[in-house]
């Protein structure tokens, strides 16, 4: 990973659990969003997954390269939580990001099922996306 800010941001957003638990959608979750795992293993998995997401975004979305670290952290967090296919459903938000209209991108991010399912996270992240 290029720096620890994004890693630390995802760690704060996901939280660490050494044993599996049932999340709000009924999914068994562990580690940093991964059932029994050491913290070191979870951190290795997290770093690898975040690097993969970052590399994919750099290779496939020109606008992502020009985002500051805070905005990249939000995008990586969304892809990490929702998967790439889930993130790509945010067509209007992505279009606003391409235009560097971060206010509109945040509005579109909040107008979603994701924001209804994880409202505190969505509000926090869309504020960060808007502010940069």
Protein language model regions, located:
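Mid-chain, well-packed structural core segment of small domains
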Residues: 64-91
